[in-house]
Design a protein with these regions (language model features):
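Active-site lining segments that contact anionic ligands and/or coordinate catalytic metals
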Residues: 233-235, 283, 301-304
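Metal-dependent active-site segment of extracytoplasmic phospho-/sulfohydrolases and closely related
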Residues: 264, 271-294, 300
Length: 369
């Protein structure tokens, strides 16, 4: 996605390698065709306000008001963690072993620029010629669709990708479409591309679409519709901006979480039984500062949280990752939550299990090595 598009999206609020053995090998797998949904939360999600370390006594010291609101959640996870109260559906998935959370993760990006951090998250590192997801899909010979206004960096570098987004234009008549098609008689490639666009439009204008253009719930529902069935894409990508909470964090995140929670439910419902063969990966570019600021918010940080959802998780219903602690000498650069594991390693592990492929080979593809 180009920087200008990304900046526009950010302003809106509405739309080393770890190996696991027995838990991964013993988890039940499906024989059906697997689907993948990659969800990027743009703006730097506060992981500590998402999966809340209520057991850490330093939380209230660093966040006197934010921690009070967050620790009021009754959505309990294991090891003393809490899930934010605005994520009730995800909590039910957790209890059903359809959600995994990973705390204190980082991509390896070393600064705090949204745009560079998002590029790093999508490339799979620095200065890549293709996106990490595009490389992984090429290895699997899979196709993808991005529910975005243009092809995001994650999916650049593969020919088996298209993008779709609700049109600003009013619906046109069939005669209009036929007239446009006739203009492409001498260019079969353009004619085919136009036909595919019309087919996508028809697929996504069925009953149940929300009235508000770009609304995440509607986009997630459309994503599920575009993935469904033998003719659907193998992978979809969604984006949701609005996570840059420098002020009034609690009410803003409450609204954001509600939108995310409802959107993912819409995705699951649209996929139906195919949810059992779906892996949803939810990540952000970096986290927030450990200390709250003077405007009831947080600033750009380092480690955040990573979420996996779906019907075929190897370790569903778990909080994974190592908690680094919140004492002064445990903070990264004296201000941030310290990353204790790498985002791309976790993604590679989950994708390797989901696709039943070699984790080391996949990790090299994801990292562009």
């Amino acid at each position: 996605m180009e920087s200008s598009s990304r900046r526009t999206f950010l302003k809106g609020t509405a739309a080393s390698l770890l190996l696991f053995h027995s838990p991964w090998a013993l988890a039940k797998k499906s024989a059906r065709s697997p689907k993948v949904v990659w969800v990027v939360l743009r703006g730097a999600l506060d992981g500590m306000h998402t999966v809340i370390p209520s057991f850490d006594p330093m939380l209230a010291t660093h966040r006197p008001s934010l921690s009070k609101a967050a620790k009021g959640s009754t959505l309990k996870l294991d090891q003393g963690y809490l899930l934010h109260s605005a994520l009730p559906n995800l909590h039910q998935w957790y209890k059903n072993k359809q959600l995994t959370t990973v705390v204190a993760v980082g991509t390896g990006y070393g600064s705090r620029s949204h745009f560079d951090g998002q590029d790093y998250l999508e490339w799979g590192g620095e200065n890549k010629e293709s996106g990490w997801l595009a490389r992984a899909l090429e290895m699997q010979h899979s196709s993808a669709i991005a529910v975005a206004q243009s092809t995001p960096l994650s999916l650049q570098g593969t020919e088996k990708v298209t993008s779709w987004y609700p049109s600003r234009l009013k619906d046109s008549s069939e005669d209009t479409y036929r007239s446009i098609l006739s203009l492409y008689d001498t260019d079969p490639a353009l004619q085919t591309a136009f036909k595919q666009g019309i087919e996508l439009k028809m697929t996504t204008t069925m009953e149940g679409m929300g009235k508000q253009r770009g609304q995440f719930v509607s986009l997630a529902q459309s994503c599920g519709r575009l993935l469904k069935g033998s003719e659907g894409a193998d992978c979809g990508m969604l984006e949701l901006g609005g996570w840059d909470t420098h002020n009034n964090q609690e009410p803003r995140l409450k609204r954001q979480f509600a939108q995310l929670d409802k959107g993912l439910v819409a995705l699951k419902e649209e996929l139906g039984e195919e949810w059992d063969d779906t892996l949803v990966i939810i990540a952000t570019e970096f986290g927030r500062t450990v200390r709250q600021n003077g405007t009831q918010g947080t600033d750009h940080g380092t480690a955040s949280v990573l979420l996996f959802a779906g019907g075929r998780l190897p370790q569903g219903g778990k909080v994974l990752g190592e908690w680094p602690g919140l004492k002064e000498n445990q903070l990264y650069q004296g201000r941030d939550l310290k990353p204790t594991s790498n985002t791309f390693d976790w993604i590679s592990q989950h994708l390797a299990y989901h696709w039943d492929t070699n984790v080391n080979t996949l990790n090299r593809a994801v990292r562009g090595a």
